[in-house]
Regions:
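C-terminal regulatory/effector modules of DNA-binding transcriptional regulators
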Residues: 93-182
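Short glycine/proline-enriched turns and hinge-like loops at secondary-structure junctions
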Residues: 55-59, 90, 121
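DNA major-groove recognition helix of helix-turn-helix/homeodomain DNA-binding modules
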Residues: 1-10
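A contiguous binding-surface segment within folded domains or other stable secondary-structure elements
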Residues: 65-113
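Short, charged recognition helix plus adjacent turn
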Residues: 13-38
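Short, solvent-exposed loop/hinge segments that bridge or flank secondary-structure elements
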Residues: 30-74, 160-167, 174, 178-181
């Protein structure tokens, strides 16, 4: 909590914030009642490599995409930091925002923010509406701020999946999530 400059209580419980953009109707949509988010809404597990330089740790979280009261696609993300407080409870970072679907490009944008930490995260993933089943898995690219002492801009790959994955598949996916510098 000291590194993030927030209270431990905030990291444990989070805070509801409003990071909803107002977009004109057109080539981008946030509306869940028009079929653009069919098969997309629901809860996803996430996996990505730690953004702390030289730290060999994989982080997991949970992303919920739900329709809000105005039929916009609201996003809530809860990231398990892998750390524990003094009573042994897991410490989470919580973000809120929204998902935006492009009607012209095969891209879903998820914009997440945490006002208390002063942080925004942008997730892009391949998109299409699903008419006969739900989206099960996607790999996305994330633009965010690194954790740790430096807190510099950072990119990483993120895996989103609905159902838990067995350990063998998880290890294979970790290899695909690496970004190799050349």
């Amino acid at each position: 909590s000291v590194a993030l400059n927030v209270s431990l209580d905030y990291l444990l419980k989070g805070e509801k914030e409003n990071f909803i953009l107002t977009l004109p109707e057109g080539n981008l949509t946030v509306k869940t009642d028009k079929g653009d988010f069919k098969g997309i809404l629901g809860t996803y597990h996430t996996l990505f490599h730690s953004t702390v330089p030289k730290e060999e740790k994989w982080l997991q979280g949970e992303l919920e995409l739900v329709a809000d009261a105005e039929s916009r696609c609201k996003a809530e993300y809860r990231l398990d930091t892998g750390q524990r407080d003094s009573s042994g409870e897991a410490i989470y970072k919580c973000y809120t925002g929204q998902a935006i679907a492009s009607k012209r490009l095969p891209v879903l944008y998820i914009i997440l923010g945490n006002a208390q930490m002063g942080e925004l995260c942008f997730v892009e993933l391949r998109y299409r509406a699903f008419h006969t089943r739900d989206m099960e898995c996607r790999m996305g690219l994330v633009l965010t701020t690194a954790s740790g002492d430096e807190r510099l801009p950072d990119i990483h790959k993120m895996l989103l999946f609905r159902n838990q994955i067995n350990d063998e598949t998880l290890e294979t996916m970790k290899e695909l999530l690496q970004i190799v510098n050349s």
